[in-house]
Amino acid sequence: YLQYTHMFREVDGALYVGQSTYGDLCMHASFATGLIGQSYPPEYSILPGTRLGYPFLVDALSATMLIYGTPLAAAFSVPGTLMTGLIWLGFVLFTWEMTGKKSAVVIAFVLLFFNGGLGFLGTLDRVTSDPTALNDALNGYYQTPTNMPDVNLRWVNALCDLLVPQRTLMAGWLCVLPALYLLVAAMRERRAAAFLAVGLWAGPMPMIHTHSFLALGVISLGAMIDCLLREKKRRLRTLLLFALYGAAACALALPQLLEWTFPQTVGGGSLRILFNWVNNDGNGGLKDEYFWFWIKNVGLVYLIFPLAALTIRKPAVKALSLGCLLLYALAETVVFQPNVYDNNKLFFVAFLAMLPAAAEILTDIYARLKGIRGRCVLAAAFILASTLSGAITIVREAKSEYQIFGKEQVEAAAFIRENTLEDGL
């Protein structure tokens, strides 16, 4: 539904988008339309002579559809809808591979796509003194309890603020979920072909979504370290298997990184040290107390992650837990792009990779409480506290509607496209 309403929906000749796509979609549209007829490697259409360093392959898909006559809205909404559905399916399969429990699959799915921290408490508190506060949350521009920078709520809802507007991230998750699935299977089977398959899948990822590629690499490094520490008798074989995976991935990825990523990140001065993400006040201090910042943003499940990592004995959970911890630490200390906020693209991969284990722990806790009166109430309270902020955000996003281009602007653009040369000035 959001892929339809938020992607240049035409109403009486004007084009409409949603709250979350009001900014991002125009950028992606400029990439998709600018790629048509370009030489290779492509350049920014608004900055001739400047190489397009942004991962552009998902927008190249829309560009191909435009070339074959697909309307602008459909060129974005159709692949977006298909990719979102595949991400849902991929996460379900990944969670099943990790847990083997239907209840854990349902819980993990709900916690990911209805995710939200404790921001709803602030909204409800404001309602007691100002009855219009709830109306603001449901109708105001970025007043939802998952994304309010003025009170340091920055974790956002994965569905509304990541998958719908951020098309490269959507494509990145489409690739990283199968990669994690293949990695877990490879660690279990210990066959060279399985590790080679992970590497061949991961290699093309940099120009699909560089952050997802980096996240997968760091998680894989942590998983390798865990395997080497636990399996002393077959360390050499383990090291060789992971080396095969890494060699295959690097052989495919390195040309992309050298051509696009490194010049923009290192040469552009984006790489720098910064502790605690957006909670850093820029003056050597923190806006909120460290753990409170994460608890109020991520929610109660943040407290479940270390419990899952420490108590579940499954080798795959142990391996991915160490990898996610390394990724979390890296994203907490190093910024890879001009906008500090975009490190959430790394945090969220660790988040989704740990959710299956967290969901399994929650099902185990519920089972251990059998016979205790009120366990259903406790479970419902946990789920409600973990999803209410996200639910409010989804309702608000579904209601949002903004005109991005008026009828006259659309007609002017069509006239220019039909009556000027492609290389005209």
Provide a role label for each language-model segment:
Residues G374-L425:
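Extracytoplasmic
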Residues T81-T84, L169, L214-G217, N339-A367:
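Hydrophobic/aromatic-rich transmembrane helices and adjacent perimembrane loops
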Residues L177-A186, I219-I225, N297-K318, D364:
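Hydrophobic, aromatic-rich transmembrane alpha-helices
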Residues T238-A251, T363-I394:
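Signature aromatic-anchored transmembrane alpha helix within multi-pass, membrane-resident enzymes
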Residues C160-L162, A194-H209:
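Membrane-interface alpha helices of multi-pass inner-membrane proteins
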Residues Y1-C175, T210, L214, K399-Q403:
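Active-site lumenal/periplasmic loops and adjacent helix-entry segments of GT-C-fold
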Residues A186-A194, L229-A243, F305-L325, R368-C376:
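Membrane-interface helix-loop-helix junctions at transmembrane boundaries of multi-pass membrane enzymes
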Residues A193-A202, I219, F242-A247, R313-V335, ...:
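Transmembrane alpha-helix segments characteristic
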